[in-house]
Amino acid sequence: MTYLSRILEEKRQAVLALKQQRPLQHYLEQETELSPCRDFQGCLKRSVDRIKLIAEIKKASPSRGLIVSDFKPLEMARRYMDLGASAFSVLTEEVFFQGSPDYLKEVRRAFSLPVLRKDFILDECQIFESRLMGADAILLIVAALDPHQLQDYLDLARQTGLHVLVEVHDHRELDIALNAGSMIIGINNRDLRDFSVNLHTSIKLRPYIPEGIVSVSESGVKTAADAALLDNASFDAVLIGEGLHVSEDLKRVIWTET
């Protein structure tokens, strides 16, 4: 069983429990009270001379286990703000990444940057949940959805005001994302089947993302040279989590502030 299949199996059970606790009507009744989402897509559009940074707030991962033992999301977010982050990504998946919706809520309340909910979205109820949680954007993973689901969830998210980062790993998935009308494409350098990382996945796929669509490279950025490679490939933004926490090299990179 791959990492992805294990995660999705557990997530399906969690979604069933969520729907029993809070039927869809619960979310629909509260949706009218929400303030507008912050402009996640707009804040990622590349500056003339510098790639943008999405800084990820992550406690653990399936492959590494616990990454940050003394986990303080607000302090982490503040450090990333000082580095010049343009947006935050907050893990809310609880079993494999030890994330929490509370982390996202805390960060969203404390800072003015747009916040991406990083989780495995498999049902429309999670989209409404994300909006009520305070997320400005959600992640939709092509490998976790069929093309019809991707299209439906992309449309629904936009109707609620959410921005959507659509994640791909190969040419086939990129074609599916583009055909669905995705406006923010994230190329994951990590293969979710075995969690191996190859930064050149991004370099290979970047030329096939049309102008006008925001391009993001995700995972595997460990050094300033890695960031420069993606910058030179004309990515709009890069999403970095563990690297920002452990790499002194990356902490010295001067990112463009929003």
From Swiss-Prot:
It comes from the Bacteria. InterPro entries: Aldolase_TIM, Indole-3-glycerol_P_synth, Indole-3-glycerol_P_synth_dom, Indole-3-GlycerolPSynthase_CS, RibuloseP-bd_barrel. Keywords: Amino-acid biosynthesis, Aromatic amino acid biosynthesis, Decarboxylase, Lyase, Tryptophan biosynthesis. One of its GO terms (molecular function) is indole-3-glycerol-phosphate synthase activity. Its EC number is 4.1.1.48. GO terms for biological process: L-tryptophan biosynthetic process. Coiled coil: none annotated. It catalyses: 1-(2-carboxyphenylamino)-1-deoxy-D-ribulose 5-phosphate + H(+) = (1S,2R)-1-C-(indol-3-yl)glycerol 3-phosphate + CO2 + H2O. Pathway: Amino-acid biosynthesis; L-tryptophan biosynthesis; L-tryptophan from chorismate: step 4/5. HAMAP family: IGPS_B. PANTHER family: INDOLE-3-GLYCEROL-PHOSPHATE SYNTHASE (PTHR22854:SF2), TRYPTOPHAN BIOSYNTHESIS PROTEIN (PTHR22854). NCBIfam families: PRK00278.2-4. Belongs to the TrpC family. This is Indole-3-glycerol phosphate synthase.
